[in-house]
Every structure is written in structure tokens, then in C-alpha cells.
Amino acid sequence: DAKLSTLPVFKSKLYRDENMNMRGMDFEAMRAMLLDTAERLGMDTDNLVITDDTPSAEMQAATVEKFASMGEEVPDGYFDPTSLIVEQDGIRIEVVPAMNAIITFDPAKVFPNGLGFHYYSPYEDVEKTAEYIKEEYKELLNMYNPITDINGGDYNIYGERGVDLCFYDGAEDLTQRIINYNFYYTSFSCNESEELFHVCVHNCDLSDKVGDYPIITAKEAKKLLLSGNFVTSVPYDFPGGEYVKKVELIYRTDAGYYIPYYRFYVELPEAEREGGMKTYGAYYVPAVKEEYIENMPLWDGSFNS
């Protein structure tokens, strides 16, 4: 069990205005991340042309016409840019408001020596390719101690198990390691031909720290779970404590705040598939002590998230 007494809570700088337009972006920081990512990929940063996602004049005109056909006007700020983009030599980078750098390769990158994977590849294939990626893309990863995180494990209707490949920096400090795992990580995705075509560098802005808050243990969180204090999107009644199979400490975004939660994986008897394949639902319990939370999420049997 993790020996932690407190964890930080952060406030997101991003929000939606009255017209549901994204606001709070730091375009200067986004530009810096864009150029830094391009440099780490070996792109010629002196000759990059930075664009944004502002719709073309033709698209704007079509949108205005569509709104007019419904007797409405386009809301203020509807066409404002939200991301920055560069493209060069088959590499495209887009930095979005959440401070993620989304990288696409066209054509996709072919791995050497029979390496490579796709979403439903065996775990061993992903693991072998991860070691190659860790070395080949070390400049992009920019981590002192890159930890391989092969996560997922869901099965489709054909019994194929899907996994995702990520890396995060394994800091010595446990709190920082949790922060890195949740907010500062890089994911790699391959196409069906097992070629690398997509990378996402996550670098969330956590500069607005609310404070460090006392947290409960996983055992205490399970007691709250069993008493109905949780948040879930599972459409069934909670089946009982004997169906709780796993717990992990993660962060969720609630009303603009990044808050630590315990995520419990619970077997769902109603959702068991043919052949005895199990289905699990995620149930979330706040890790912050109850006296610091204004409204504990009490389960009322409704479909919530």
C-alpha cells in the first residue's frame, strides 16, 4: 500500500464560456510546447509555419448559412482558434488546450526486426516494441526514468484483448510519480499493419495548485464504497463487496478541479458474457478526507458519471 498522507488538488485553467466555447488557453505555452516537441522530433524549427484550427472562410460561410436556416446567429467566439498546428516532412503536430501534443506520422513509421503491435496484439509483442520505442524516441520522451505502462486489457466480442502503450517518468518521490502517471505521460498507437502512426504527449498545466489535502487509505475508501459513497457510470445496482476485484489511486476532473480518487474495479454479474467472460465496472471514491469535500457523491441508483 502507498504510504501517503496528503495529495495535491489542482484547478484547471480551462473553462467553457456562455456559448460553450473553450476558454483559458495559454497560447504562448502551447506555442512553446509545439516548438519543443518539433525540435525533439528533429524537425527544422527555423522553417516551420505555425497555423491554427480557425475554420476556412468557406467553412465559416457555410456555418453562418446553416445557423441562419434555423433562424439563429453564430454565437460569439464560435470560430475562435483553440489549437496550434505545424506540418513538415510527413510529421504533423497539433497542441490542444489541455496541453497535449498530438503527433501523427504519414506515412506511418515501420518498426525494424519484426517489432510492432496493434491494439489487439499479444502483451509480449507490445512489451518488446516498448523497449525499442523507449530508446528510439528517448529525446521525445525526455524522461529520466521512463516507466513502461501497458494498460487496458479489455476484450472485444471476439475475445481479443486490447492494450494501450504509455510511458511516464518514474520519479523517486511517490507523490510526483502519481502526478506523472496521471498528467505527464506519452502514449504510442499503431495501425493495423503494426506501424507507428500516432503519439500523444500529455503535459497538463498544473500551475494552479489549490493545496495539499489529507487523504484516506484504500481500506477506508472501500468502506465508503460499500456504504454507497461513490460515482460511477455503471447502469446496474452495486453488486456487493465480494465483487470488488481491484483498486488504484488516480485523478479525475470534477467541475474544473483535478481531484484524487480511488478507482475500484467491480465484477458485474449482470454483464457476464458467453463463455464466462467477466465484465468489470469502475466505481470512484474521493481520496480526499470527507471533511474537506462539500458534497460526497451519494449513489441513488441513477445512471451517473
Regions found by a protein language model. Give the residues of each.
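Preferential activation on post-signal-peptide N-terminal prodomains/segments
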Residues: 1-178, 303
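Segments that shape or occlude catalytic/ligand-binding pockets
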Residues: 114, 118-280
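Short, low-complexity, Pro/Ser/Thr/Gly-rich segments in the mature regions of secreted, periplasmic
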Residues: 287-305
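Short, solvent-exposed coil/turn segments at beta-strand boundaries
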Residues: 90, 97-100, 189-195, 257-259, ...
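Generic ordered-secondary-structure signal
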Residues: 1, 242, 250-252, 290, ...
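Intrinsically disordered, low-complexity regulatory tails
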Residues: 276-281, 285-292
